[in-house]
Amino acid sequence: MKSPNAFSALLDIYISPSKAFNGVEHAKGWSWLAFITISLVSMASIYIFYSTVDMQFLINEQFAAASVDATIGEQKMIRQSIEQNAGIQVWISMISIVLGTAIIAAIMAVYYMLIAKLDPESEHSYGAWYGFTIWTIMPNVVLSLGTIALVLSASTDQISQTAVFNFDSINQLVVGLEPGSAFYTLLESLKLSSLWGIGLGMVGLKCWTNFSTNKALLFSALPTLVIFGIWAIIAAM
């Protein structure tokens, strides 16, 4: 079975991802709708946060995180830089999330295209794999909606940026390390939405190739395993 249209695929990617990937496989333009959806919801979460948060509180939080190991002179420069850019942070963040999504998809599309060559019957183009990657990033929509809900339901405007944007991180949910810890940034970057994306990648690879479940899971998880494995080794040194 496959999704009959792009709008159905936007729902199916969450409740029946194989239908979404089967529909996307030979469709034209569907992935643009997914990219636009991710971008708009992500930008909305950023805009709502910056429109709500106490900027001085945010500046202090960002300064505390960025100046853990800094000298007094470096701390002054860091605070000055943060304060100078405070007014444009919202626009920088919104542009960055869109460009970041596009760049990550571009890199991962190359990876998927290369590993798909292990299946002699797979003949998908780079553009097809680019669209494929966009659909594996769709959990970011749920993440952004969660951020919006946390911001709008907050009882104060002194809202932690890390708490609302990384609420699904392993560090926030389980470990609870403080800034300055060797593994803090790593565990803040490892999120449930990322693991969800790996699962979607596995389902998609099974739909688009003849890979077994185990092989599809391995290939979907491999980039994350390599990146976080190297990161963990460096953090432990």
Where are the regions that the model predicts?
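Short, membrane-interfacial amphipathic segments enriched in basic
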Residues: 1-15, 85
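Short juxtamembrane and helix-loop transition motifs at transmembrane-helix boundaries
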Residues: 2, 92-93, 179-184
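Short, exposed beta-strand "edge-strand" segments with a Pro/Gly-rich flavor and a Y/T-containing core
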Residues: 12-13, 49, 64-69, 117-124, ...
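A generic alpha-helix surface/boundary motif
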Residues: 15, 109-113, 198-200
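Hydrophobic alpha-helical transmembrane segments and adjacent short intramembrane/lumenal linkers
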Residues: 127-237
